[in-house]
């Protein structure tokens, strides 16, 4: 071999490129979206510049690329483009992740999200649209910004869409996007009810009901507000003051106290009285004393009530309709009622006097036949 010529020709190694990108509605295969080469040697790296094209814009795998201006580049790479040639390229178009925003709703104690709650889809290509069907969920029902689990939803094609125009559901995917639902506090109107007490206070402890609690939940009310009139009335608007919602079986943070009204009902009076046996069942107003009046208030009353028996004993006054109450010192009759109270009346035994006369008989005996009562 000595003295001869000995030559080896090293030819360029052909490379096949794989390009991958998210669906964008176009036919381009950009070198900047290079995924891999099939035959780089010795751990070398190369890049791809320029643009090629494919014939189908839709999601697909291994579409043949018309190379166009695609070219190998070694700028910043460890390999040398002189050692390689670009033989062909394939393009993988993968589904485009989209995001969804749902209509803000008031707290409703539900973790269900309906497709009909959809407000907007974002990250769609151009003028393409899709529709959404199905039912899905959020992790909890409480107030806040929630991430929607989209597993129960289905994307549907735009009406009239085909392979060349319009939105195709197969080109998109919900996974990888952001999916948010905002839940706001539900406003509540409280009804407070109490008997007349001579004040303008509306205490939370006198709560009667809320108008819009969800899912059978309960709340209570603390603090107090005020009204403009202390007298019996329905639906007086309350200045809320320190009134505040308190957790019950539900969370107060899921609600807001929007308004309150106060119903002041008549104060129930009690009564008691007594008389000496008089052989009738009348209970005269003059023998009856009223109680449970607001401190500092008095009423006048007149008429006749009825008890169950004329005989001596303790009774309940049964016919209060015969007693009329009227305004008195500081007291307004319309703020009171006798209905519903306790009304007791006692008939006491009547004392009987005895007298009599007889002729002197030298004894101390008083014989009954000589006596009379009066």
Language model features with spans:
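Short loop/turn motifs that initiate or flank beta-strands
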Residues: 1-374
